[in-house]
Amino acid sequence: MRKPGIVALAASLALLTAPFASAQTSTIATAGYWKAFGGRSNDGTPVCGMSASGKGLFFSIKLFKGDDEMTVQLGSDRWQIKTGAKQKIVMRFDRESPWKATATGFRFSDGDAGLEFSVGVKNLDTFLVEFARSYSLKIEFEGSDVDGWTADLTGTAAVTGAFANCVDKRL
């Protein structure tokens, strides 16, 4: 049985660690491994997001005011990715069709390596509904010797709802 559907904006992932880039955000909901947050980015732009961390891994979804894309960030304290390097990623929510992207390497404020890519507004609702309804997310790194992840999505329906409320109020 699937989790109840979430309309509009919502999402997040699990089993992942790195600090938020912004000291101006606060947690607005927690469920399972997941947290929804809202506030302002380092440059003062309003932002809403969801994240999970643990075992040296990090996953977040962020939507900034004025953007027509949602930002997805992955991180690991074990990665040796160069800033600007490209990495193909395949993500699959349960048995849904895969999401494919080419991510770009960057550094979190603590120095850990990360990968970042965007999901366009035209695909945002589908992405968030799959995220909120699914039980797990499998992430694979094509053409790399980096092991893939399986993220526990327990709690994503609840934090996706909080994320959607944040977007409605702040963005």
Feature annotation, model-predicted:
Residues 18-19:
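N-terminal signal peptide c-region/cleavage motif recognized by signal peptidases
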Residues 24-85:
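An ectodomain-focused feature that recognizes extracytoplasmic/extracellular
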Residues 72-104:
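Mid-length scaffold segments of soluble, non-membrane domains
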Residues 9-12, 22:
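Hydrophobic alpha-helical targeting segments used for export or membrane insertion
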Residues 1-9:
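Bacterial N-terminal signal peptides that target proteins for export
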Residues 58-68, 85-91, 120, 125-136:
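Extended Gly/Ser/Thr-rich low-complexity repeat segments
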Residues 96-171:
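Internal interaction segment
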